[in-house]
């Protein structure tokens, strides 16, 4: 293959051919670089919605260059005839590559940091043109017209100076740059005199006498004016738009941020009046024409922003700009500062956040006017001593550094410091050098550290303390000046404040281990907000509830059983009592708390409610009432209507059977009503009087009549799913406000086409779709089913989407997903539509669940294209598939997630979390990774102020802080796995794993279960988008893939054994395929096995049983059929019952001959058979077997068992009898009788002399109450079914005739997917 200049770089190609691909396969260090030209940039800027692949394919100047990871940019430039190569990340900034940089290695490193591990896969991804949305190379620097307009406008136009007609029009070069209009004195020449017209504070006017003309005027009494005439309307509008921004400014500010600049525009130096220059997010160079070394030319410059320029070294020449008062140099990779910085004597604000600084120079202390110094997210291990000299500073802002010790003595020496911000450090201990009090520090922020004990009692002037998300066990403070205390998410058992904080207004002690409310909090006279939720409180002090200043009290998630009775009137406005153990509320609650507007008493045990009326008239001002998940009955309804100002009422999951029409009629202010999860049969017709009602949620009831809600003028959301609706009465005109109508789960509801046409204007109409029978769905429908619920809450749009495929990958698996875009709906919908296809492709390429799941997320991240550059989404994907890697399981569940969506598995009634929450607050490792990458984490815990997530799909512009690599977990599914819950962030913020599992594990319908979860979240205070999916799992015997499923087990030839068979209890799992073998292996004990004759409940089994040569490998068992332990018998009793009812009534005298080796007692036959045996490794080498072996199935095979027939020598051979196609088909019919061919007089198809060694058939199993089965009396030994060698062909012929002569009835629905079990019954 021809190379260009070097063996490392090949000629450019316009497409991939076979020769190029062969060359790439030879070495993973080879690859290609897509090179975009200038015309490609135009296509990209004009078509913002097209993907990278489409734009690249349509571009005439796009081509690829084959190269290696060692090929430098200079070599590619030489081969392409270019001066430089340019790199663009995420469709944003463009920087020039250095000649020594290696483009292909840059791509490989980028993909590796995203999460790709396999070098071959990295090579493959690098050749994908879709990657251009994240990383691309240009042969020329792209020029975006809209950005150029904001930097500089220029052209040759007709110009006239002055307002009068004395001057003539003449063609001149006109430039608009910075704050000035520049007009040359000579046409198309800048060598002559340049006329400068400052525009700040001036004005721009339209010249009416001349088309497309503007008049530019400067400010002041001596204002000058220039008239400029443009040729086109587009030019006229561009100049007018940009000039209007300049003249509207009060100060001379130039914003050139995010323009990929390497130097200052030449014409900008004409604007000598510039005072503030913003150059952040560029690639400014230090030493080059127009670089940072020329900024000293701006003689009046006061403010300079050079953040995010990746300078690496501090530009020393900046220290010569003595006029600077503000300087921002954050996120530039500085490791130290020069001593010359002390020359900036006028500097007042210096921002150095996001660098690698460990010390500050002493010369910084010369800046006596410095009042703000930001050194957050650096590498300081202690507070710099220079703070003591900077007396104008009043704040120590050092968030995100490496401090491990809090030395209060250092702070005591800084008398000028009032605010201390040390959040997100590594603080573990605190040092107090002396007992001297500190009277100057008023605000301290110690969030997200590792403190276990904190004593700040020496800070007697402390007004506000943030110490949340530590590991505090005890907290001691001074209460002289304390006004606000945030101490949530710790392990506090004691909080000591002395003296009583008389100025305290806000106290947050939530999510701790407090057993009582501190006494000092009860005595605080000005406290307005108290949050002690998520603690261990058992009682509420009277003084707290009776406080005359308290406005908001949060007591949720405690163990409170009673509330004190109110005696005096209180000003309480918000009361949260959810998740306690309350059985009643104080009788005087509503009569004494007249200002109460919000009450949440959900998840308690309330059976009644206090009256809202003190006399004949109600004075209640209650507006929001949440009483979900209690024990309320119809008797509470008359009490509720006393709250005439109710706007939101939640009564879900109670015991309501009726809602009196006369009572609902009184709630005229009602806007939202939730009655779901009750036993209502109707909604009163008086609901039509609730004219302000916009939301009605009444799912999971017994409603059969559609309520009269379509006449409400403001109705928007109606949820009547999971009811008994049969028809809908539609008015003549539907309300235009109706946006969402949910009628799913009403199995008897049939909507005509006319009705659907009327509902066509509704944005979201949810109805049941009748599924079409498919072969794929019948395979997996037995194993799992799902229900989905999504609610917008108080938001205007739904930004949560879900993916649900019960039949996936040709019907052998299932895929479920949840996507949460937070504030955007585009990305969740894109992922909903594309992620399953990506998974299917990846599954075909790899069988490793970690590999194909990770690649699914990474490829989906790439496929988001331009939409994923600025937007992001949390993603959760669950894949159920047959477990081929683990022979001990039937199905495996693989879960992958990024962001805050989570999946929880219910196993044996207990929750098993399968996901990881990638957020700064809940994942310290991820928070440290983001800190190490020098991201700026704002006070609300968001990366660069955008998102709290550290891993997402999309948001590529936040790379490398935000990554798409998912957390992956796999678990084998067992019979104990009941259901799987998928939910977004809002769901899990308001429901614990245990509560979610307990709330739905007994709900029969998965749709109703998902609805219930969303309703609970909303009733618990969720106002955001909430989404929940519940997947019911039915992994039983029919899902088994081990060698025990449907197999018969041999016993030693001629080894007669008997067991006394007793009645057994009904299995705990009512599935017809719930595994007799597995039940026996766990239930049988030594006392249950009789040893009258030939009992094998001893070690004699090894001597008389199978030869060890017949066991080439260990048995492959699943959780449904575990391997017997030493405490269990190796041989287990069969579930077969042997009856003589199959024999003819008229028998010959030969029928009375006794069977040798079988002992009967007149009523029972004791038989022991081994039903656990290994499958032969190679069935193909077995001797010839009978093609069609008869099988006996009871008509109700849900309670019976079917037994396969083994040849007489099959026990010795260790091989199982394979079933033919005919036998399998006949086996599905529950009405198929025992025999295929003609029976002899003794009920067998073989002579008696050949029928003494094998049991013939097994009849229906009686109800089992113990480990034994009672057999019919008078067992006839001739009823054994034998197939000797010499009659095999005759047996096959007779069975075939029998099968052809009988019609196979239609099987039951449950029998289609649950084939009967089979066991060998050889003695």
Curated annotation (Swiss-Prot):
Topology class, membrane: Peripheral membrane protein
Annotated spans, Disordered: 1060-1157, 1285-1323
Family matches, as Pfam families: LRR_1, LRR_6, LRR_8, PP2C, RA_3
Modification type Phosphoserine: residues: 1210
Effect of residue 1024 to N: Decreases activity
A single GO BP: intracellular signal transduction
GO molecular function: metal ion binding; protein serine/threonine phosphatase activity
Name of the featured protein: PH domain leucine-rich repeat-containing protein phosphatase 2
Originating gene: PHLPP2
């Amino acid at each position: 293959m021809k190379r260009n200049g070097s063996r490392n770089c090949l000629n450019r190609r316009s497409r991939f051919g076979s020769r190029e691909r062969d060359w790439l396969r030879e070495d993973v260090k080879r690859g290609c670089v897509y090179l975009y030209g200038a015309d490609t940039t135009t296509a990209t800027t004009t078509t913002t919605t097209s993907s990278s692949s489409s734009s690249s394919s349509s571009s005439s100047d796009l081509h690829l260059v084959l190269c290696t990871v060692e090929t430098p940019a200079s070599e590619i430039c030489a081969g392409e005839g270019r001066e430089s190569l340019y790199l663009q990340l995420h469709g944003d900034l463009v920087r020039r590559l250095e000649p020594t940089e290696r483009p292909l290695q840059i791509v490989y490193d980028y993909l590796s940091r995203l999460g790709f591990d396999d070098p071959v896969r990295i090579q493959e991804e690098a050749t994908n043109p879709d990657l251009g949305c994240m990383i691309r190379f240009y042969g020329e620097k792209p020029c975006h017209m809209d950005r150029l307009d904001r930097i500089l406008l220029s052209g040759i136009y007709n110009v006239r100076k002055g307002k009068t007609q004395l001057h003539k029009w003449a063609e001149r070069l006109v430039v608009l740059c910075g704050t000035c209009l520049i007009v040359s004195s000579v046409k198309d020449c800048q060598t002559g005199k340049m006329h400068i017209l400052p525009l700040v504070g001036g004005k721009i006017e339209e010249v009416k006498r001349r088309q497309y003309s503007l008049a530019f005027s400067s400010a002041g009494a001596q204002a000058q004016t220039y008239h400029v005439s443009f040729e086109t309307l587009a030019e006229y509008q561009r100049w007018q738009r940009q000039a209007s921004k300049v003249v509207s400014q009060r100060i001379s500010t130039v914003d050139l941020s995010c323009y990929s600049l390497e130097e200052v525009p030449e014409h900008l130096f004409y604007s000598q009046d510039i005072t503030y220059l913003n150059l952040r997010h560029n690639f400014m160079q230090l030493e080059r024409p127009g670089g940072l070394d020329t900024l000293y030319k701006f003689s009046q410059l006061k403010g300079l922003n050079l953040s995010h320029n990746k300078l690496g070294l501090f530009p020393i020449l900046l220290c010569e700009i003595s006029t600077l008062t503000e300087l921002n140099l954050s996120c530039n990779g500085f490791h130290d500062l020069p001593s010359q910085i002390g020359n900036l004597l006028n500097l007042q604000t210096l921002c150095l956040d996001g660098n690698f600084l460990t010390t500050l120079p002493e010369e910084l202390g010369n800046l006596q006017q410095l009042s703000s110094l930001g050194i957050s997210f650096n590498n300081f291990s202690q507070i710099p001593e220079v703070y003591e000299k900077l007396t104008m500073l009043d704040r120590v802002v050092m968030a995100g550094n490496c401090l491990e010790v809090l030395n209060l003595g250092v702070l005591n020496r800084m008398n000028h410091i009032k605010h201390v911000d040390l959040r997100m450090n590594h603080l573990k201990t605190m040092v107090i050098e002396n007992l001297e009090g500190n009277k100057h520090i008023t605000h301290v922020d110690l969030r997200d550290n590792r403190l276990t004990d904190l004593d700040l009692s020496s800070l007697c002037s402390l007004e506000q303390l943030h110490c949340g998300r530590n590991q505090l066990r005890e907290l001691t403070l001074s209460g002289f000046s304390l006004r606000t205390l945030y101490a949530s998410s710790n392990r506090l058992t004691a909080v000591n404040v002395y003296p009583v904080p008389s100025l305290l207004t806000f106290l947050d002690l939530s999510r701790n281990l407090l057993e009582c409310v501190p006494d000092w909090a009860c005595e605080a006279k000005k406290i307005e907000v108290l949050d002690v939720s998520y603690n261990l409180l058992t009682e509420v002090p009277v003084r707290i509830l009776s406080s005359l200043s308290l406005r908001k009290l949060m007591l949720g998630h405690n163990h409170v059983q009673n509330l004190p009775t109110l005696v005096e009137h209180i000003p309480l406005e918000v009361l949260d009592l959810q998740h306690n153990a309350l059985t009643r509320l104080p009788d005087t609650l509503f009569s004494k708390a007249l200002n109460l507007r919000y009450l949440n008493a959900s998840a308690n045990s309330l059976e009644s409610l206090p009256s809202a009326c003190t006399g004949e008239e109600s004075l209640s001002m209650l507006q929001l009432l949440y009483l979900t998940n209690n024990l309320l009955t119809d008797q509470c309804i008359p009490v509720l209507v006393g709250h005439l100002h109710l706007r939101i009422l939640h009564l879900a999951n109670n015991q309501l059977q009726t809602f009196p029409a006369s009572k609902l009629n009184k709630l005229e202010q009602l806007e939202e009503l939730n009655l779901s999860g009750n036993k209502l049969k109707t909604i009163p017709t008086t609901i039509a009087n609730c004219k302000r009602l916009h939301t009605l949620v009444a799912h999971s009831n017994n409603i059969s009549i559609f309520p009269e809600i379509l006449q409400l003028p403001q109705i928007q959301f109606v949820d009547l799913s999971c009811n008994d609706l049969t028809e809908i009465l539609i008015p003549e005109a539907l309300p235009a406000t109706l946006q969402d109508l949910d009628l799913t789960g009403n199995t008897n509801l049939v909507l005509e086409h006319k009705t659907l046409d009327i509902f066509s204007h509704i944005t979201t109409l949810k109805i049941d779709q009748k599924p079409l029978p498919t072969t794929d769905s019948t395979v997996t429908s037995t194993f799992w089913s799902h229900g989905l619920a999504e609610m917008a809450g108080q938001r205007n749009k739904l930004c949560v989407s879900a993916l649900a495929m019960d039949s996936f990958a040709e019907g052998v698996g299932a895929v479920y997903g949840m996507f949460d875009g937070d504030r955007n709906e585009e990305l969740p919908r894109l992922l909903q539509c594309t992620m399953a296809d990506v998974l299917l492709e990846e599954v075909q390429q790899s069988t490793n669940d970690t590999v194909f799941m990770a690649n699914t997320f990474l490829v989906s991240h790439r496929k988001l294209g331009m939409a994923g550059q600025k937007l992001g989404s949390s993603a959760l994907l669950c894949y159920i598939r047959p477990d081929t890697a683990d022979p001990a399981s039937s199905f495996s569940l693989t879960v992958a997630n990024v962001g805050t969506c989570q999946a929880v598995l219910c196993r044996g009634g207990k929750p098993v979390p399968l996901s990881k929450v990638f957020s700064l607050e809940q994942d310290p490792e991820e928070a440290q990774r983001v800190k190490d990458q020098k991201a700026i984490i704002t006070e609300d815990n968001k990366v660069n102020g955008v998102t709290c997530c550290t891993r997402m799909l999309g948001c590529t512009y936040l790379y490398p802080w935000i990554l798409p690599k998912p957390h992956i977990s796999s678990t084998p599914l067992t019979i104990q796995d009941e259901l799987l819950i998928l939910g977004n962030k809002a769901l899990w913020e308001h429901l614990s794993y245990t509560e979610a599992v307990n709330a739905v594990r007994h709900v029969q319908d998965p749709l109703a279960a998902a609805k219930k979860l969303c309703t609970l979240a909303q009733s618990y205070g969720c106002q955001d988008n909430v989404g929940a999916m519940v997947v019911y799992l039915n992994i039983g015997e029919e899902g088994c893939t081990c060698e025990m499923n449907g197999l018969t087990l041999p016993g030693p030839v001629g080894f007669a054994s008997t067991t006394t068979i007793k009645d057994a209890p009904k299995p705990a799992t009512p599935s017809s395929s719930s595994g007799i073998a597995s039940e026996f292996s766990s239930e049988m004990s030594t006392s249950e096995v009789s040893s009258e004759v030939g009992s094998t409940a001893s070690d004699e089994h090894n001597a008389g049983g199978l030869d060890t040569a017949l066991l080439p490998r260990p048995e492959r068992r699943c959780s449904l059929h575990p391997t017997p332990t030493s405490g269990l018998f190796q041989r287990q009793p069969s579930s077969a019952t042997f009856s003589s009812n199959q024999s003819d009534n008229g028998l010959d005298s030969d029928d009375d001959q006794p069977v040798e080796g079988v002992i009967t007692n007149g009523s029972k036959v004791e038989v022991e058979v081994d039903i656990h045996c290994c499958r032969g490794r190679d069935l193909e080498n077995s001797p010839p077997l009978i093609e069609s072996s008869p099988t006996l199935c009871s008509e109700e095979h849900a309670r019976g068992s079917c037994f396969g027939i083994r040849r007489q020598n099959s026990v010795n051979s260790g091989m199982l009898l394979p079933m033919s196609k005919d036998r399998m088909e006949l086996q599905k019919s529950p009405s198929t009788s025992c025999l295929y061919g003609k029976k002899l007089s003794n009920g067998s198809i073989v002579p008696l002399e050949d029928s003494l060694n094998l049991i013939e058939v097994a009849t229906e199993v009686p109800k089992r109450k113990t480990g034994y089965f009672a057999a019919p009396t008078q067992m006839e030994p001739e009823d054994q079914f034998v197939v000797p060698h010499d009659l095999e062909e005759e047996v096959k012929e007779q069975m075939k005739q029998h099968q052809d002569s009988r019609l196979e009835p239609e099987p039951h629905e449950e029998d289609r997917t649950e084939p009967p079990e089979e066991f060998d019954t050889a003695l």
